[in-house]
């Protein structure tokens, strides 16, 4: 069954994150687990105090962000709407023997949590949502958090990391997102950098290239590129 799906897998899903989350959680897992130096989670505590807090991690995916946050938090509640991703997250938490992390099925637009029920809300690159829905999940984060709400996004001009100039035919929504967070909701923001090391061209093509497009695959192969530099924007409101 798995072998048949791999054999029929397209060369790329061309920026269709909804397809990635629903049908290829194993590719997302390989992509998100490719090492970053320094990691986002190593840099976040320099911006927001995470220690000893109960954190709702919205859009938890396969659990990588939730388990990383558990190094600092008292408890992490990962919220994920895609069933395939949620299964992997729960398996990963069991495999890690983590007692601090639990996962709930739920949507960023209607969190399965009561008002003021957690100390802090995080959302690590909620890429699936169009800009017009950001207002709703920001309001949901503010509703359930007693303290800070922290979202990680991509600043204008950095979609896809340092290959943003290669990526074309993608709706550029970064400016809209920036306006919503900073102008409408008065979030503070700070940019951080991280280098993602894939080590081999084969690995970067089968993960990054599969996600972002055939043109990117051609570029990666031609340039023998194995590292992507990312610029992330941390938005937070206390």
Predicted regions and their residues:
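Conserved class I S-adenosyl-L-methionine
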Residues: 2-51, 150-178
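Class I SAM-dependent methyltransferase SAM/SAH-binding core
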Residues: 56, 62-110
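Class I S-adenosylmethionine-dependent transferase superfamily signal
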Residues: 69, 140-141
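A conserved beta-strand element that flanks and buttresses the S-adenosyl-L-methionine
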Residues: 122
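Short catalytic micro-motifs in class I SAM-dependent methyltransferases
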Residues: 125-126
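A short, conserved alpha-helix within the catalytic core of class I
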Residues: 129-140
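Conserved Class I S-adenosyl-L-methionine
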Residues: 183, 189-238
């Amino acid at each position: 069954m798995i072998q048949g799906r791999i054999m029929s897998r397209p060369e790329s899903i061309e920026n269709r994150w909804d397809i990635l989350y629903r049908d290829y959680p194993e590719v997302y897992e390989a992509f998100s687990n490719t090492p970053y130096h320094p990691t986002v989670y190593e840099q976040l505590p320099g911006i927001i105090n995470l220690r000893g807090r109960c954190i709702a991690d919205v859009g938890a995916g396969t659990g990588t962000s939730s388990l990383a946050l558990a190094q600092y938090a008292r408890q992490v509640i990962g919220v994920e709407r895609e069933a395939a991703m949620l299964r992997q997250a729960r398996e990963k938490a069991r495999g890690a023997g983590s007692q601090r992390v639990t996962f709930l099925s739920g949507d960023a637009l209607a969190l399965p949590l009561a008002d003021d029920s957690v100390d802090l809300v995080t959302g690590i690159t909620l890429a699936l949502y169009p800009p017009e829905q950001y207002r709703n999940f920001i309001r949901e984060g503010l509703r359930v958090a007693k303290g800070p709400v922290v979202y990680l996004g991509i600043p204008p001009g950095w979609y896809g990391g340092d290959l943003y100039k290669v990526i074309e035919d993608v709706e550029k929504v970064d400016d809209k997102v920036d306006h919503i967070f900073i102008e409408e909701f008065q979030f503070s923001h700070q940019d951080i950098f991280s280098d993602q090391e894939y080590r081999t061209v084969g690995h970067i093509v089968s993960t990054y290239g599969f996600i972002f497009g055939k043109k990117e695959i051609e570029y990666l192969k031609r340039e023998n590129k194995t590292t992507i530099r990312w610029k992330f924007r941390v938005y937070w409101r206390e």
